[in-house]
A protein has these predicted regions:
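N-terminal small-residue-enriched
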Residues: 1-199
Length: 199
C-alpha cells in the first residue's frame, strides 16, 4: 500500500505553488509499503513535533481566517505492474463493483465510516451482471484498509475530488482531490440503504 500527499498534482484541487505560510508545494509519502511514513505538516506542527520543515499544508479559505493545517491531495497509488479493472473483476465470484463517491459519514476520530458511490454493478462469476442501487459500504478505517487484497495498475487510476472539505472553529472549507486506482477489497460490510432507511 502506497499513499502520497501531494500539493503539486496536475489538476489537483489542493494543488498550490505555495501554501498560506509561503511554503512551496511538494509531494511526499504518507504510507509506504503499508507502513506510516509521513505526515501533513504546517510550520507550527513541524516545529512542535520536531520535523525539519513544513510540507506546505497551511490553508486559509479567506483573508478573515487564520491558516489551518489542511489536507494535501491524498492518493492511493497504483501498482506499477498492477492488473486492469477487468482482471480484478475476473477474480471475484460474488461482489459489487463501486464507481466514484456520492455521500459519506465519518466520526470525529476518522475511524467508523459509511460511504456510497455513484454507480454500482453486481459481480457474479468474474463478470459484471447488471446495475444496483441503494448501496452503501461501512467499516472501520483499519478493517477497511486491512481488507485490501489487490491494487490496479496505472491505467486504472482516477483523480477525483470534493470542493467542500470542512474543518476548524470557526469553520473553513477547502477543496481537495483524492486519487485511486481500482482496488479489490474482501469482506467489507454492504448495506441496502433503501431497507435501512425504512426501518
Amino acid at each position: 500500500m502506497h499513499v502520497t500527499g501531494d500539493r503539486t498534482a496536475e489538476h489537483g484541487l489542493s494543488t498550490v505553488g505555495y501554501d498560506d505560510e509561503g511554503v512551496a508545494g511538494q509531494s511526499w509519502d504518507l504510507i509506504r509499503d503499508g507502513v506510516l511514513a509521513g505526515y501533513q505538516l504546517d510550520r507550527r506542527m513541524a516545529l512542535l513535533k520536531g520535523f525539519g520543515r513544513s510540507n506546505g499544508c497551511a490553508f486559509s479559505d479567506g483573508p478573515g481566517h487564520m491558516p489551518l493545517q489542511r489536507m494535501a491531495n491524498v492518493s492511493l497509488q497504483p501498482a506499477a505492474d498492477g492488473p486492469s479493472t477487468a482482471d480484478l473483476i475476473a477474480g471475484v465470484e460474488d461482489g459489487i463493483y463501486i464507481l466514484g463517491d456520492k455521500s459519506w459519514s465519518i466520526d470525529m476520530q476518522r475511524y467508523n465510516f459509511q460511504f456510497t458511490g455513484q454507480r454500482f454493478f453486481r459481480i457474479r462469476n468474474g463478470r459484471l451482471d447488471g446495475q444496483l442501487r441503494d448501496v452503501a459500504y461501512q467499516a472501520t478505517t483499519t478493517d477497511f484498509w486491512g481488507s485490501m487484497e489487490a491494487v490496479g495498475g496505472p491505467q486504472t487510476y482516477v483523480l477525483g475530488g470534493a470542493f467542500n472539505c470542512g474543518k476548524g472553529q470557526p469553520g473553513q472549507v477547502a477543496p481537495v482531490s483524492h486519487g485511486c486506482p481500482a482496488a479489490l477489497m474482501r469482506g467489507v460490510r454492504i448495506l441496502n440503504t433503501a431497507e435501512e432507511g425504512a426501518s
